[in-house]
Amino acid sequence: TALQRGARVYLPYIEPGRLRLWFTPYCADAAQAERAHGRLKIPQFHGEKIRAHRLNTLLLPLVGIDSEGYRLGQGGGYYDASLAATRHRLQPHKIGVGFACQRHNGRLPREAHDMRLDGFVCEHGWRRF
């Protein structure tokens, strides 16, 4: 695994009331504290917080992805806001993660702030855009 090879793995951290994501290091041994509120009860991790532009590779969840590499997210805007903040900085490799059934052969709706992904990985393999 990436962890066994010495890679540092970061997980998204959502600050209450904020749209841009922070990323915190994953540590298998660290205790995780659940959010005190929120219907999703997303685990929150403690430690160093960094922004997306400091990452080498960013794996993005998606609802759909089109043939040009534009993703359709879940509508929260967290990844869009985080990626928009990297436009004028060194950007991480942006890789969409999903299933083959989420690929769309046409063009998905997009807005001016949407950014094209560098690739997509699913159970059938990898595609670079």
Where are these regions (language model features)?
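Short, basic/glycine-rich phosphate-binding loops at helix/coil junctions
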Residues: 22, 61-63
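Surface-exposed, charge/polar-rich loops and edge strands
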Residues: 48-58, 65-70, 80-129
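N-terminal active-site beta-alpha-beta segment that forms phosphate/nucleotide-binding
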Residues: 1-54
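Alpha-helical protein-protein interaction elements
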Residues: 15, 70-71
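Short phosphate-engaging motifs
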Residues: 19, 78-79
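Short, conserved beta-strand edge motifs with alternating hydrophobic and charged residues
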Residues: 10-13, 60-61, 97
